[in-house]
From Swiss-Prot:
GO cellular component, one term: dendritic filopodium
Region: Disordered, residue numbers: 1-88, 109-221, 340-497, 579-660, 931-988, 1073-1160, 1197-1216, 1297-1378, 1403-1460, 1471-1490, 1506-1638, 1779-1801
Subunit structure: Interacts with KNDC1 (via KIND2); the interaction enhances MAP2 phosphorylation and localizes KNDC1 to dendrites. Interacts with DPYSL5.
Compositionally biased region (Acidic residues): 1327-1337
Location of region: Calmodulin-binding: 1447-1467
Species this protein is from: Homo sapiens (Human)
Name listed for the protein in its UniProt record: Microtubule-associated protein 2
Gene that specifies this protein: MAP2
Polar residues composition bias: residue spans: 63-73, 416-430, 1609-1619
Entry-annotated residues carrying Phosphotyrosine: Y745
Amino acid sequence: MADERKDEAKAPHWTSAPLTEASAHSHPPEIKDQGGAGEGLVRSANGFPYREDEEGAFGEHGSQGTYSNTKENGINGELTSADRETAEEVSARIVQVVTAEAVAVLKGEQEKEAQHKDQTAALPLAAEETANLPPSPPPSPASEQTVTVEEDLLTASKMEFHDQQELTPSTAEPSDQKEKESEKQSKPGEDLKHAALVSQPETTKTYPDKKDMQGTEEEKAPLALFGHTLVASLEDMKQKTEPSLVVPGIDLPKEPPTPKEQKDWFIEMPTEAKKDEWGLVAPISPGPLTPMREKDVFDDIPKWEGKQFDSPMPSPFQGGSFTLPLDVMKNEIVTETSPFAPAFLQPDDKKSLQQTSGPATAKDSFKIEEPHEAKPDKMAEAPPSEAMTLPKDAHIPVVEEHVMGKVLEEEKEAINQETVQQRDTFTPSGQEPILTEKETELKLEEKTTISDKEAVPKESKPPKPADEEIGIIQTSTEHTFSEQKDQEPTTDMLKQDSFPVSLEQAVTDSAMTSKTLEKAMTEPSALIEKSSIQELFEMRVDDKDKIEGVGAATSAELDMPFYEDKSGMSKYFETSALKEEATKSIEPGSDYYELSDTRESVHESIDTMSPMHKNGDKEFQTGKESQPSPPAQEAGYSTLAQSYPSDLPEEPSSPQERMFTIDPKVYGEKRDLHSKNKDDLTLSRSLGLGGRSAIEQRSMSINLPMSCLDSIALGFNFGRGHDLSPLASDILTNTSGSMDEGDDYLPATTPALEKAPCFPVESKEEEQIEKVKATGEESTQAEISCESPFLAKDFYKNGTVMAPDLPEMLDLAGTRSRLASVSADAEVARRKSVPSETVVEDSRTGLPPVTDENHVIVKTDSQLEDLGYCVFNKYTVPLPSPVQDSENLSGESGTFYEGTDDKVRRDLATDLSLIEVKLAAAGRVKDEFSVDKEASAHISGDKSGLSKEFDQEKKANDRLDTVLEKSEEHADSKEHAKKTEEAGDEIETFGLGVTYEQALAKDLSIPTDASSEKAEKGLSSVPEIAEVEPSKKVEQGLDFAVQGQLDVKISDFGQMASGLNIDDRRATELKLEATQDMTPSSKAPQEADAFMGVESGHMKEGTKVSETEVKEKVAKPDLVHQEAVDKEESYESSGEHESLTMESLKADEGKKETSPESSLIQDEIAVKLSVEIPCPPAVSEADLATDERADVQMEFIQGPKEESKETPDISITPSDVAEPLHETIVSEPAEIQSEEEEIEAQGEYDKLLFRSDTLQITDLGVSGAREEFVETCPSEHKGVIESVVTIEDDFITVVQTTTDEGESGSHSVRFAALEQPEVERRPSPHDEEEFEVEEAAEAQAEPKDGSPEAPASPEREEVALSEYKTETYDDYKDETTIDDSIMDADSLWVDTQDDDRSIMTEQLETIPKEEKAEKEARRSSLEKHRKEKPFKTGRGRISTPERKVAKKEPSTVSRDEVRRKKAVYKKAELAKKTEVQAHSPSRKFILKPAIKYTRPTHLSCVKRKTTAAGGESALAPSVFKQAKDKVSDGVTKSPEKRSSLPRPSSILPPRRGVSGDRDENSFSLNSSISSSARRTTRSEPIRRAGKSGTSTPTTPGSTAITPGTPPSYSSRTPGTPGTPSYPRTPHTPGTPKSAILVPSEKKVAIIRTPPKSPATPKQLRLINQPLPDLKNVKSKIGSTDNIKYQPKGGQVQIVTKKIDLSHVTSKCGSLKNIRHRPGGGRVKIESVKLDFKEKAQAKVGSLDNAHHVPGGGNVKIDSQKLNFREHAKARVDHGAEIITQSPGRSSVASPRRLSNVSSSGSINLLESPQLATLAEDVTAALAKQGL
């Protein structure tokens, strides 16, 4: 298995390169072939323009394509519950529903397919096979049903067998083995021969079909599009078959290798299933084609399949799939295999031709194949009962034998003909391998387990099969998919028998397998992730051999539950059936884990990008290496999504079809959900949430439902807008609460609407996508999209799970995983498919492996943890339907498929439409976001925009969770769309919880692929580059990544503008792209600068993502804790990544400083981020993550704006606006305006100063927003991760204050950069976190106290009244949580001395002394700006466009929080507002101290930047040096203080555990970010302290308290102390860098010394707090001592002795009694002894008697008596006694003796036969009993 895994990994590697080739060349033809010839995928871009043929398939299967969508609707309608339950559950439900519908449709569709079959007759082989088909009419229906059933079974089997395949690639064939072996067992020679022969003919046919398909496909595909690749693949396949024959010649000397190769394919198909998912571009890249074919097949199949299989087939399909498909599908497959293999070969020929001829031929071929399917489906209709009879593997082997005999004869004829045909067809490629495959298949089936298992090692043995397997896996992966699917349907023989069907279904099933894999990947992403997929996969690869039989039986049995769940399966496929599988985890593992493993396979494929699987990692690297592999992944995930849809609805035949269609959206989201689930599983696994099994199950229960429920609840509520967090709680909340919210903004009817719109859209959008993909631009994006987006996204969720999202799999963990997980992930997947997805995908592939593996592990663990079973019950909403609903509802039909940008638009259109729906539901949140974005983008400072934001705020408050989650989801989606387009694709994922993994992968991959993604972004934004180009050219000196990001931003902005809502989309996309661009820029600078941050950032990001996902997964169970974890994760993913991004962006900022236009762009980005931020507040984690990212980027933008625009007014304005918006949300707009003006005046006064001010403002605003959120989720806030992202000029300071008391997992991300002075702004990430934690502790502690009352006031007051707020925040936090206490502790160093002080008092004291002049100047500047930019508007609405832009972000973010927190904050905060307004000068002063502090914070950021910010190389080096100098002072001083302080109070242990571990795990980036975050919490209070301290001794006193926190903080994040020390240590102590350094100087003295002393007090406090706990524990230990004394008391011992004595006595007595009991009486004690003697000797005697009696003259009764006694003389002696006794007590004393004696004596009458029998029986019984 390890070899197999390695081979899987190998296969991915070579599959990555050669398979990429094959994917690009060989497999696109094979994709068509796999796509069922009719997948009709043009493969324009990446062989991905599957839409044409796919649509042709859809058109041809117009009803089916629509039916797929309709089915998705119907199934999704059913699955609405199902998908809510789980991807797998949905998958199973879809399998059942689709099977039921397919069964229902099958009857009508079979007739259609009969007609189609008549069409199919056009195919010579199909005709011949159809001709062969009649000889086996049952098989013909079985074949038809094999096509359908096999399709369904392949869908189900893909789900199962792909699960199994992926779980047990061997098992797929070992299933055949097992079936064949079962047949062997049943018919050891003949049946095995039949099984092997049928299997062999089938295998031969399958393999010839496979090979022939590979030969035909590869030959014809070579003819068609990739002749050499296909030929190479075919030759490789032959090589693998033949060399495999040589290499794997274990028991399969020459032929076994081919089966081994086939097994390798099966195994490697599992591997390839993975590969197919990601690495095997054939089923994956062809996956779109294959899904086309599969979709068409599935269209055919679902129609009859859903109907005919409704009861019988779902089970046969899943469980009955093994059952019915084995029988029916054996017959069917044998029959169908004959027609199908010829049909497929003919389609192969046709496909080759059609590949040449194009989609039309593929469509025709598909149609032909589909008619073949239809015929077999019709024919299979008869067998369904048989299939139903075959629900169990026992039946399967028997029926398989029966069918094998039947099919063997018929299929031998057909297969022989077909094999001859195939051999003739395949002879050029490998006729001998066909025979070898036949023979080998016989041997293989005999030795399938060995062969498969050996083949797995052998597959790993012959690396050349890597090349060979590239083609082989491509073809064979198709076929293996088909085979595995067929095997799943036909278990083994069906797999092989069905392999001709497998060939066609290799095309179809490859598509379907891709679909199923996608489904299975999506579902198994859940299931697999639930199941320890790697464990299961490896085990299952081995176990699959075992489990395949068991899995066939289990699959039959489980599939019977699946079947039972047919209708229930829609709900319980994962839930009930999967729970059954969970119960049958091991057995069902085959089936269930087939789903799981299919998903794992897919997931591993996707987790190739998301190293959810080892092979996933390997393959992930491989897939990462080759874009076609990501296309394979993408296609695989698309295929998975489609394979999954095959089970569900075959929404898009091709992955992109379903990906880009509503189906694609739904499935993209579903896939994202699955990938998120995968990611969640991965995350859970990373968390080690009970290992893969536990986590996978848990993920199935929780995380998978996260994604599923994301889609489910989203689709149910609003697929995209309200992507449910993969969190079980979130899903429950979202499903129940958020779903209600979603219903608020997305009515339950919307799913149908979304769904219904989806179907036409699917064809339209598929066509559009095809066209878009055909478009050159789209070629890049669409191709990448096909490959990378789904796979990467899938990996990220779904992780995957997956990600999947993270890779699609995670990103179940944060709000993004919750809200944006599906939406963001699906859209990331889609958008990945749109923009630069290969790069993103590859970067994901490259970077996520760490993250993804964690994701994979976490997700699988999380899913297992969730068990995927319970959660599925929770989430009954169909995953596809919700996502499809949300996506369809978003009017994605036209928009999403318009092109690459259109795809992004579609995603954004989906998002925007979803957002519009959300806006409809959420009021004008998105419109306001758009207005805000527009205002930001236009920097037209519309007061109305802010007013809208306030309206939005109100609406957000009304729809805080609903709308903002949706908006956040949309922001995520848009973010994802943009990030998909941009390198920031995954960073945007960071923006949301779900996107964490993706964002991590993105962040991880972006630094690697930042340039390429930027290049791709440039491509995607090329049309729009002109917009950015002036500033970019101006900035060209600046970081190219920033340029590329700005390009993408503006281009995406333009694209978005050209999208549905030009402004909405632009704003959204600008927001998203701002995030993405900033992130890519950040990454590019990181990459360029090669800062520690890049590596550390990547590692941290990966670790963080894993930890984040782990947190998410772990925290997901309860929404509150989930929220806290999500927020932490969001902070970590978003905050730390954002810190990374912000640092990079800051570096970019420094570069961008020169270009005002860049600043404008960044303002737009800030606006985007502002808009982005508005979404997040609903989702605490996504809110904070997005907020953090948006704010960080916004700050970053503002920083560059402020720097670049030397007119601080403009650059200040965006920051100001964004931050005041937060404050506005937190408090009243007037206050925001005042502060904004204050900040802006400060900005005018000093850009850097203003920046610090803005940072502080941002800190305050973000803190206010966070407070809002905290207030919104006061309970959550405890467990909340307060992430203060402060972007200073050089640094992004993310202060994560994790109050792990975390009643809720809310993650508050504050962006301090907006509200902090520029100097402070650099520290803003840290300072902001510090502000967030400390101002949150100080300013927000009070606002949190009064947070419900006046959210904005805390922010304002935070800036103006840092200590006062600290007090309030302390109070609030004390009230709220230990986090508040930590905030108190954080603020205690400020508040301890100034607890009762109002912020005014301390700040006035602090500010005047510290930076009185500076603050006065700044105050004048800020007041200028306030006056210039209406102070009222600043508070109420900022009229300045940029300010508006800046405001919008906070406003949106704050809006949620305002709604939540206003009640709490409003009154207190209004008072504080008054104070803040009254003390806006003080705030300026605070900002100035913040500036002073900000420098250190900025230095902290610099350190972080070293960690994460590679962009600010020019600024960073000096700052870094300074930072290092300061780090020396401050790292030991401030960082430790900060690190220890915030977390120790309440966050410290949890936060430390989460953040600290995450920081350490995340490496320096995480450490820097976490440290910065934690320090920033201290840094901001220290800033306040610094301000106060510099100004007043009181502040130093507070600062003294403050440093206390950092040491504790440092203890939390030991590695991060340096960063806080930067903030504490001025950037340039004596070098005032435009007032940034000057304040930093002041901060230095104040911060350095006070933080040390404060750190100790804080640490002491924190330590004291734990120590009292420890003392309490000691008291408990005292109790333990008492316990010890109690035992010493001897009572326990006495009791124990007594008990022991009693027990011993009782036992002895019991033994004696037992003796007497056997004796049957006191008198019979001797008899008992005799019994002993009898037993002892009677055994021998019995044995003797047994031997002798049987042989000892049975005829001679007397002789027997004599002989008996003589033989058992010793016994006869006893026997004499016994006989003597036995007459009286014979029955009692020695029944054995009595029997013998009776036999001997009284039973003498019984003549020798009976006597001998009795003697034998007695002796046997005596021997048994006696022995």
